C-alpha cells in the first residue's frame, strides 16, 4: 500500500520508483545548496545557484544562508538583492523582477496543502514580484500572489492576495496602509561586496 491508501501494482511500480529516485536527486541537490549558501564568496555562491537551475543575472545578489526548493523554477531579474536566510520556492515558478530588494528572512512559497481535502494534496500557485518592489524582513509571501511594480511589503507581513502597483501593505494578513509617493521608479540598489 502506498502512503495515501492507493494500492501499488506491477503496472505502476516502475514509474513510482523513477519518481522516487528523482525526488532523492532533488533532495541531494537542495542539501548541497544549503551548504553552498554559507560559502563567504558571493560570486562562488552565484555560480552554484546558476548551475542548479536558478535563472539570475550577473548584477543580482543572493546573500548568505538562502535556501531553495526546485531552483529551476526561479527567475531573478537585474540588480535585485535577496537578503540573508531567505527561502525561495520554485515549484510553481517564482519570478522576481529587476531592482527588487528582498530583506533578510523572507519566505516566498508557491505551494501549500489543501487543508479541506481528505488527501491533504498540494495546491500550487506561481508567485510574481514585479520591478522595484521592497519586501521587509521576515515577511511571508503565499502561493498565487502577484506583487505590483514599486509595491512595499512591511516587515513581518503575510501576503495572501495580489498587491497593486506602488502600494504599501502591512499586517497579518497584509492590508493596504498607504500609497507609495514616488512618480519615477528608476533607482539602482548598488553593487554587492565580494564577501557578502
Regions found by a protein language model. Give the residues of each.
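Residues that flank catalytic or metal-binding motifs in active/ligand-binding sites
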Residues: 104, 155, 165
Amino acid at each position: 500500500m502506498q502512503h495515501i491508501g492507493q494500492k501499488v501494482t506491477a503496472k505502476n511500480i516502475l514509474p513510482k520508483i523513477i519518481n522516487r529516485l528523482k525526488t532523492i536527486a532533488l533532495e541531494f541537490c537542495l542539501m548541497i545548496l544549503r551548504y553552498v549558501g554559507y560559502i563567504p564568496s558571493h560570486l562562488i555562491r552565484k555560480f552554484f545557484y546558476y548551475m542548479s537551475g536558478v535563472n539570475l543575472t550577473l548584477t543580482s545578489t543572493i546573500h548568505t544562508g538562502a535556501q531553495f526548493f526546485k531552483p529551476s523554477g526561479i527567475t531573478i531579474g537585474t540588480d535585485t538583492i535577496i537578503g540573508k536566510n531567505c527561502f525561495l520556492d520554485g515549484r510553481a515558478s517564482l519570478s522576481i523582477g529587476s531592482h527588487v530588494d528582498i530583506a533578510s528572512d523572507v519566505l516566498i512559497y508557491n505551494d501549500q496543502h489543501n487543508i479541506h481535502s481528505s488527501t491533504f494534496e498540494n495546491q500550487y500557485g506561481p508567485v510574481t514580484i514585479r520591478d522595484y518592489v521592497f519586501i521587509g524582513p521576515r515577511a511571508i509571501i503565499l502561493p498565487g500572489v502577484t506583487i505590483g511594480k514599486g509595491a512595499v511589503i512591511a516587515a513581518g507581513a503575510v501576503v495572501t492576495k495580489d498587491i497593486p502597483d506602488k502600494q504599501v501593505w502591512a499586517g497579518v494578513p497584509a492590508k493596504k496602509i498607504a500609497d507609495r509617493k514616488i512618480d519615477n521608479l528608476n533607482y539602482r540598489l548598488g553593487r554587492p561586496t565580494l564577501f557578502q
